[in-house]
Each structure stands twice: as structure tokens, then as C-alpha cells.
Curated annotation (Swiss-Prot):
Coiled coil: none annotated. Binds 16S rRNA, required for the assembly of 30S particles and may also be responsible for determining the conformation of the 16S rRNA at the A site. Signal peptide: none annotated. Pfam families: Ribosomal_S14. Keywords: Ribonucleoprotein, Ribosomal protein, RNA-binding, rRNA-binding. It comes from the Bacteria. This is Small ribosomal subunit protein uS14. Part of the 30S ribosomal subunit. Contacts proteins S3 and S10. Belongs to the universal ribosomal protein uS14 family.
Amino acid sequence: MAKNSMKAREAKRAKLVAKFAEKRAALKAIISDVNASEEDRWNAVLTLQSLPRDSSASRQRNRCNQTGRPHGYLRKFGLSRIKVREACMKGEIPGLRKASW
């Protein structure tokens, strides 16, 4: 199990990403716009740099919903490989079976 502080930190990052998503997208559009003036683009870069670091989506880490484990995460289920296996063996995931050949 991951520490509760790590889970809380990820939740905080998710809130920040949602809060600043529109502002970041607008600034990035200005930065990548070749028709904008150099001064506008430079101001957009500086404004983007002044935003909180954790408001960037790339700083988020996918974690297991049950344990908070960061590695072996399966997007389709939102769980780590260990918890997916346990749920599969209990028959809690419809249509998923252990492979046999």
C-alpha cells in the first residue's frame, strides 16, 4: 500500500490540473501561434512558467485505486496488476479469465 500522503499528493495534483487546464491550453496556443508577436509569445511563456508546477498534466502518476501502487497499473481497470489478478480470481471482473493453452 502506498502512503496516504502520496495518495493525497496525487489527488491535489489532479485538482490543480483540472483548475488550470483551460489557462494552460490558452497559453500554449499563444506560444505555438506563429502569427502572434514575439512579445505576446514571450509573455505567454513567462505566464506559463509562473503557474504551479503541479498543474502540468505530465506530473500526474497513474495509481491503483485500491492500493495506490504506482507500478503495474492497468488503465482499463484503474487497478494494479496484483489487484486485477485478485479480482479476476474472485470472478469480480466480467469476461476476464486466466489464460490457459
